[in-house]
Each structure stands twice: as structure tokens, then as C-alpha cells.
């Protein structure tokens, strides 16, 4: 496996976790009445989710085994 693919594989879980974290922070900000911050955090969650989708696509196309993130990605998608 190419070194860059190994590095990308290591980022998949990070991106999904970041998406979930930003989504959670967005909800907290919304509950606190900080709507502007909530929207920015939600945008950040969406960006991280898109990064995860792109990473998964690259790894799948390259035939690289990677952690099964379908459950967490579904949770992240639901939170968006």
C-alpha cells in the first residue's frame, strides 16, 4: 500500500469523530441561544462529514481495507 493511502486511512475515524463532535457542540450552542455559533459549528460538522465520505471513497477505490465506519457515519449524517 502506498504511504499516502495509509495516512489517509488513519484520518477516516478522525473525520467522523470530528463531525460528531462539531454537531454536538452546535446543538449545545443552539440550546444556549448562540444561533450564529451553532450555524458555524453545524457547517464545520458538515465539512468534516464530507471529508470522511471522500476519504472512504478513495480507500474503497484503491481497494484499501479500512475501519467500518458505516454506523458512525450514519449517526453523523443523522445529526446534520
Label the model's feature ranges.
Residues 1-80:
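Non-heme di-metal
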Amino acid at each position: 500500500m502506498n504511504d499516502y493511502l495509509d495516512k489517509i486511512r488513519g484520518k477516516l475515524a478522525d473525520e467522523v469523530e470530528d463531525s460528531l463532535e462539531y454537531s454536538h457542540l452546535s446543538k449545545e450552542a443552539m440550546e444556549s441561544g448562540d444561533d450564529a455559533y451553532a450555524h458555524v459549528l453545524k457547517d464545520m460538522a458538515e465539512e468534516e462529514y464530507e471529508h470522511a465520505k471522500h476519504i472512504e471513497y478513495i480507500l474503497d477505490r484503491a481497494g484499501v481495507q479500512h475501519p467500518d465506519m458505516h454506523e458512525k457515519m450514519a449517526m453523523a449524517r443523522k445529526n446534520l
